């Protein structure tokens, strides 16, 4: 868990998936973490590398895997906050609510990511008092979620969404965050939400960790 949360974002999704069965594990749930450990051992020289002189600008990637949990059909949120060319904060977590569409799942993931980015911005302004309030770009590959976040009006398609997720609309209106569309192939938070083929996994891992 420490590796997944502190130094190896490339293991976060696998550790999250296995951790769900920690209470009543079976043989399969034992073999899987062994595979994760073998991967970590074989890539023990990998680590997060920051670029000197690249500034303190924060950018974020938000993604969701809709209804991926078979038992209760809950989706998975994934988010990564980048600074100085590499990931400084990331998460892979099962959403606490059951969402009714891919757009809604992505919207909830956006809210989770923006909360993490807000905290990091508070830390930055505490360490660097003259830093000021920056506008943080959040990259999202779902146009529906992007439009929903930028629309201050609740419609029949969004009025059921829990109000705690709508705070991001005010932040976008104030100009504190901007949601930018990114192609799915370049959605680097994908590695935090779902299993990927080897090529895609390495591409996103190398980007987040600046390998």
Indicate where each model-derived feature is located.
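C-terminal reverse transcriptase regions that engage the nucleic-acid substrate
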Residues: 1-46, 183, 192-193
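Conserved catalytic core of Hanks-type protein kinase domains
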Residues: 6, 39, 82-84, 112, ...
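RNase H-like nuclease module associated with reverse transcription
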Residues: 21, 57, 75, 93-211
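Acidic, metal-ion-coordinating active-site neighborhood of RNase H-like domains
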Residues: 35, 61-70, 189, 193-194
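Structured nucleic-acid-interacting core domains from mobile-element enzymes and related host factors
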Residues: 38-64, 129-132
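Conserved helix-loop functional segments at active or binding sites
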Residues: 42-46, 67, 87-89, 119, ...
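RNase H-like nuclease fold core
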Residues: 60-103
């Amino acid at each position: 868990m420490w590796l997944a949360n502190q130094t190896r974002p490339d293991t976060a999704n696998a550790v999250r998936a296995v951790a769900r069965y920690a209470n009543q594990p079976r043989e399969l749930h034992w073999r899987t973490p062994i595979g994760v450990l073998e991967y970590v051992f074989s890539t023990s020289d990998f680590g997060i590398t920051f670029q000197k002189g690249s500034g303190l600008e924060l950018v974020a990637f938000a993604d969701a895997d809709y209804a991926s949990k078979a038992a209760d059909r809950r989706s998975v949120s994934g988010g990564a906050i980048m600074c100085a060319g590499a990931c400084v904060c990331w998460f892979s977590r099962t959403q606490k609510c059951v969402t009714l569409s891919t757009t809604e799942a992505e919207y909830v993931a956006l809210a989770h990511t923006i909360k993490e980015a807000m905290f990091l911005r508070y830390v930055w302004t505490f360490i660097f008092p003259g830093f000021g309030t920056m506008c943080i770009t959040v990259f999202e590959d779902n146009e529906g979620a992007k439009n929903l976040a930028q629309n201050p009006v609740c419609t029949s398609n969004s009025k059921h969404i829990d109000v705690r997720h709508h705070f991001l609309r005010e932040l976008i209106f104030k100009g504190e965050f901007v949601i930018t569309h990114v192609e799915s192939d370049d959605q680097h938070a994908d590695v935090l939400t779902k299993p990927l083929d080897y090529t895609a996994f390495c591409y996103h891992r190398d980007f987040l960790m600046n390998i």
